[in-house]
Regions:
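Acidic, surface-exposed loops and disordered segments
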Residues: 1-100
Length: 100
């Protein structure tokens, strides 16, 4: 399945679609929680007019993200995370984060 995130207001540009991305993030998290694979795909914006024509979008409706969602082919288990102290710093670069 594809979800096409669109706006109907304003002149189309990548900045004006910024309000869509928090909703897209929530959809990605929800898909993951349901065991589905999903990703944000904005590459169609390089061919905006052709993409909108192929999707059959009416005039004034502009797509900003396509989210393909489906069942993964391989193993889709829990995410493994490393320690934060190697990637999160406190106050300045290289100073390990001291969690409370």
């Amino acid at each position: 399945m594809w979800i096409v995130a669109c706006l109907t207001e304003g002149t189309p540009n990548r900045g004006s679609g910024a309000s869509i991305y928090p909703a897209v993030q929530n959809m990605l998290l929800a898909a993951r929680a349901l065991g589905l694979g999903a990703t944000l795909t904005p590459r169609h914006l390089f061919y905006e007019k052709e993409s909108e024509a192929a999707l059959g979008l009416p005039d004034g409706v502009h797509s900003y993200a396509i989210i393909p969602i489906g069942y993964p082919m391989g193993k889709f288990g829990p995410v493994k995370r490393g320690p934060l102290n190697g990637i999160v710093f406190q106050d300045r670069w290289g100073m390990p984060y001291a969690s409370v």
